């Protein structure tokens, strides 16, 4: 649809039928083939399709839409079209709406779902910015930092981690302001690493379970990350906030690159490793957003072997009125100039982001969410030891006992501290090993994670509510 009003009306018709899937399908049959503009990217469209006109996805519809395995709240979903644009195959990205109005995208190639927005109104603002796949494609990449010779040199090496590390060592410290148009990244700066504390001292927050208010040594950082990454990797830099007057960089997450060129973040407040980007170029486009709020949902094994952060639930407790998408109260919000934060405001924002993540993980465990099984044992132990646990719950001891009940023996992880290398499957071997394939690394990660877990599957994770009309069509 070329007319903006007609496009908005079409989105509105979809939104108001979120609770009536049969009515929604009737509308889609009438509008089948219609192309709707999206907020981002500009050259992409959603081609509306009914549930019987989605090609190979029809055979997967029951699993994806009705079994609740792909989203945190086991929400019923309904497809309403596929993404059409440069670089995409037909039916590769299927767009769905949840029974409570959330907008999702199923990636057929990667067998995962991205939660694009909690409401249709938010989707009209953000488009597909929360779908990682777009940020891996050159046509849609928009960096959040200003490229210079340093970045260009680093991006040339891709999977050559040794040369990349040598380049960072040679050039030394450099910081870059993060320009996030939607203000979703809690960090204000990214900085390349340096050991020279006279140039800049990397300092952790008081929430850190590693070095509260201090600085971690590079080798200790590697020792903590290698049981998760399980292959050769190097330190690239850090995300957080730079305070030039004090020559300090307040770290929210350290940034590492493995031998395959994948970028990870190490969170010292959670003793956790999160996948940030598929490569350095994608990292410049998303920075620390995936290490703050991850929108990718997938099965437990896939989430663990990819080191995906547990996704943040955006579902409102009460289904919002779909008609709010026509409100104009904040349409000009994004056009206003953003205020430059003071150091105090920037530091407070980092602490708020860290606290939010801690509270999110505690809630997963206390509510027996299926996503709690995605947490690594080190994360559970870090929650037990966290100085911020009292901010997350009133029953600190009760929560601590529940966290410990989920944590198995950490002896398997302690091998890395003792530097035992008699067994090729120890972490000292992982640190220097350059495996021949990604499959070996994935196998190691899943094995290592489950060794340290206890009571992997909570009671609530095994069952799903029975299918009831209008969802019965999924079995047909």
From Swiss-Prot:
Pfam families assigned to the protein according to its UniProt record, in alphabetical order: US22
GO CC list: viral tegument
Keyword vocabulary terms for this entry: Host-virus interaction, Inhibition of host caspases by virus, Modulation of host cell apoptosis by virus
GO biological process: one example: symbiont-mediated suppression of host apoptosis
InterPro entries with a match to the protein in the record: US22-like
Chain coiled-coil ranges: none
Function: Plays a role in the inhibition of apoptosis by interacting with the pro-domain of pro-caspase-8/CASP8 and thus preventing its activation.
Family per record: Belongs to the herpesviridae US22 family.
Complexes and interactors: Interacts with host pro-caspase-8/CASP8; this interaction inhibits CASP8 activation.
Name of the protein: Viral inhibitor of caspase-8-induced apoptosis
Source species of the chain: Human cytomegalovirus (strain Merlin) (HHV-5)
Gene: UL36
